[in-house]
């Protein structure tokens, strides 16, 4: 388990500070399989996970949903046959917060033991 995945999420408000450029460079190194996507006026973390079939993809989607519910921080999830796209960003503040990187690391942990991964 990575230190980032073990970190605690904090309550996030609309006026919470977004990660700085320096923090962004440091944190993205801890989740190297994630991409930073710029959408409109904000950045998001995104990764595609491949599975052998829809059933495995759906089970992974539900597992990500469960960890999101535990901390009250929710991603965008797109479930397709054999593929799940997970996108983390802090909706309230329209950008990236440390919580997004923590949850991306936790998503990677789930993926490491997910059934049916390609």
UniProtKB/Swiss-Prot annotation:
Its EC number is 4.2.1.96. The keyword Cell membrane does not apply. InterPro entries: PCD_sf (IPR036428), Pterin-4-alpha-carb_dehyd (IPR050376), Pterin_deHydtase (IPR001533). Keywords: Lyase. It catalyses: (4aS,6R)-4a-hydroxy-L-erythro-5,6,7,8-tetrahydrobiopterin = (6R)-L-erythro-6,7-dihydrobiopterin + H2O. The keyword Glycosyltransferase does not apply. One of its GO terms (molecular function) is 4-alpha-hydroxytetrahydrobiopterin dehydratase activity. One of its GO terms (biological process) is tetrahydrobiopterin biosynthetic process. It comes from the Bacteria. It is an enzyme of class 4 (lyase). PANTHER family: PTERIN-4-ALPHA-CARBINOLAMINE DEHYDRATASE-RELATED. Belongs to the pterin-4-alpha-carbinolamine dehydratase family. This is Putative pterin-4-alpha-carbinolamine dehydratase. It comes from Stutzerimonas stutzeri (strain A1501).
């Amino acid at each position: 388990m990575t230190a980032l995945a073990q970190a605690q999420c904090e309550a996030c408000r609309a006026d919470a500070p977004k990660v700085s450029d320096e923090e962004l460079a440091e944190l993205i190194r801890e989740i190297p399989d994630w991409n930073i996507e710029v959408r409109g006026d904000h950045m998001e973390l995104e990764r595609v996970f491949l599975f052998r079939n829809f059933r495995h993809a759906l089970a992974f989607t539900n597992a990500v949903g469960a960890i999101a519910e535990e901390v009250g921080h929710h991603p965008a999830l797109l479930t397709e046959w054999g593929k799940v796209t997970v996108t983390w960003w802090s909706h309230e503040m329209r950008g990236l917060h440390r919580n997004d990187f923590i949850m991306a690391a936790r998503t990677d942990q789930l993926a490491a033991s997910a059934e049916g991964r390609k």
